[in-house]
Amino acid sequence: MTLDVGPEDELPDWAAAKEFYQKYDPKDVIGRGVSSVVRRCVHRATGHEFAVKIMEVTAERLSPEQLEEVREATRRETHILRQVAGHPHIITLIDSYESSSFMFLVFDLMRKGELFDYLTEKVALSEKETRSIMRSLLEAVSFLHANNIVHRDLKPENILLDDNMQIRLSDFGFSCHLEPGEKLRELCGTPGYLAPEILKCSMDETHPGYGKEVDLWACGVILFTLLAGSPPFWHRRQILMLRMIMEGQYQFSSPEWDDRSSTVKDLISRLLQVDPEARLTAEQALQHPFFERCEGSQPWNLTPRQRFRVAVWTVLAAGRVALSTHRVRPLTKNALLRDPYALRSVRHLIDNCAFRLYGHWVKKGEQQNRAALFQHRPPGPFPIMGPEEEGDSAAITEDEAVLVLG
């Protein structure tokens, strides 16, 4: 998606970025960061398209301390990206350039944009689609942690989508190496995705610090957000939102959760553990039953004629299934006596009879509410199924109805 160009998006002059211009031709603006702009660019020799992140590091915009901080963070990001190069779900760094005034990072061009924008368009994702995205994300996080790298800024805005809707983790500006047993104390990241230990660490000088577990908390927030269309921790007053995070206060109360499985709710609860020691690791999360469900096989490569035949067979099969479902099957006396409530037609008669006797619906369980299914009483007595014998009544009496209902 092309963005409008403002004064802050002006391209560096040739002298300030000669090495970059010799190899790439910058095009339209496709994204912006706090201190950077992202443009589509074309490799002059091959014509291939990429994305370039351009950061201005001049004294006009930043103090000397800020200049050095930006340069150091970019160098660290470049080093980490080169270390993790080749992973299918991590953005690939193609080139990097540094001049006295600008820094350039050239990446693969992810045409589908951010996961955040995709979620905004869809409102909420299905469990199937969420499963695919979260599996890829956790595989990337597991790879980072295995290489002693913590991301520290996982969120939908930093997850990009390629042409095949596969994700790539990006924006490693807050990432750093973390040796086993080492702890961090720096407050960084996005408020709604911060783990409780990061907040506690910033408030308590005696706090031991935080580790890689903060990435798994963020994964839990992302998982919740994809399914609900809104984050688990939010309040218009940020101080109250941060308190909710530190106490782990969230609920599955919105209507979207009515159709979500208990399995995915369990995974969320295991990721959003306030105690980092009780939180799942990336490897443990990938072993959760939520990811064990069958994703389906790859589609066949069929010719147009074969696809047409499959479509015809599908329509014929659907018609036969519908016919079989609605065909009235013979009802035996033994089946009726064994479990009358298991038969739909008889069940309707029983429920309506109960309403006539008691004046209200008779529930068969605490979770059962059948009132919406039976809104009209029958116009007359219920016929007895099966042949009548001499002396039998042609209608069910009230005493017989009570006996059937037990």
From Swiss-Prot:
User: Known EC number(s)?
Assistant: 2.7.11.19
Q: Where is this region: Calmodulin-binding (domain-C)?
A: 346-370
Name the reaction it catalyses: 2 ATP + phosphorylase b = 2 ADP + phosphorylase a
GO cellular component term, pick one: phosphorylase kinase complex
Q: How does it assemble?
A: Hexadecamer of 4 heterotetramers, each composed of alpha, beta, gamma, and delta subunits. Alpha (PHKA1 or PHKA2) and beta (PHKB) are regulatory subunits, gamma (PHKG1 or PHKG2) is the catalytic subunit, and delta is calmodulin.
Disease per record is:
Glycogen storage disease 9C: A metabolic disorder manifesting in infancy with hepatomegaly, growth retardation, hypotonia, liver dysfunction, and elevated plasma aminotransferases and lipids. These symptoms improve with age in most cases; however, some patients may develop hepatic fibrosis or cirrhosis.
Annotated function: Catalytic subunit of the phosphorylase b kinase (PHK), which mediates the neural and hormonal regulation of glycogen breakdown (glycogenolysis) by phosphorylating and thereby activating glycogen phosphorylase. May regulate glycogeneolysis in the testis. In vitro, phosphorylates PYGM.
Q: Would you tell me the protein name for this molecule?
A: Phosphorylase b kinase gamma catalytic chain, liver/testis isoform
